A protein has these predicted regions:
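Catalytic-domain carbohydrate-binding cleft regions of carbohydrate-active enzymes
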Residues: 1-166
């Protein structure tokens, strides 16, 4: 089964589960209780099925962020946050790639904002590397490739190109 193959890859250290929440939740309207339960159920599933506990929250495709997220993440044992949607602004460029996000109670969580999706070709990778805003603290960028909206994942061409880009 596909899930059986994933379990084997996790055991081999070749697949790192991420996220820690049950699904990628809406973060504009739900209460803190709702967000906390996403982590309770998500982390429980990862522990029961994969003997794994996520310490990074990967939330690439939401349209808003509750100011309580840093506090909720820390209380749920999550120490880092990765997102992409802050780049969907044509007027104001967000000034940071990597930063400490302070929640409404002052709790901070290390946050990385990946500014774009990636087609794994040399031109795109060079352009994205040149676009890193704070090279003194970050000199590489995650290349999250594939098509996420509506599913689909990476194209065959993307997977075939990846080994040549090391």
């Amino acid at each position: 089964s596909i899930f059986g193959n994933i379990k084997r890859r996790v055991e081999e250290g070749r697949w790192e589960p991420n996220g820690g929440s049950w699904i990628e939740p809406d973060c504009n309207i739900p209460s803190g209780e709702s967000l906390t339960r996403h982590f309770l159920y998500g982390q429980s599933f990862l522990k029961e099925e994969l003997d794994y506990r996520a310490d990074q929250f990967w939330m690439p495709d939401v349209f808003g962020y509750s100011a309580s997220i840093p506090q909720i993440l820390k209380l749920c044992g999550i120490s880092g946050f990765l997102t992409t949607k802050l780049s969907w602004n044509e007027e104001n460029r967000f000034p940071y790639d990597t930063f400490l996000w302070s929640g409404i109670d002052g709790t901070q969580v290390l946050t990385h904002f990946n500014t774009s999706h990636c087609w794994p070709d040399p031109e795109t990778l060079v352009a994205q590397t040149m676009d890193i805003q704070h090279k003194d603290i970050q000199d590489t960028r995650l290349c999250s490739f594939g098509y996420g909206d509506g599913g689909g994942g990476p194209l065959t061409e993307m997977l075939e190109a990846a080994p040549y880009l090391k």
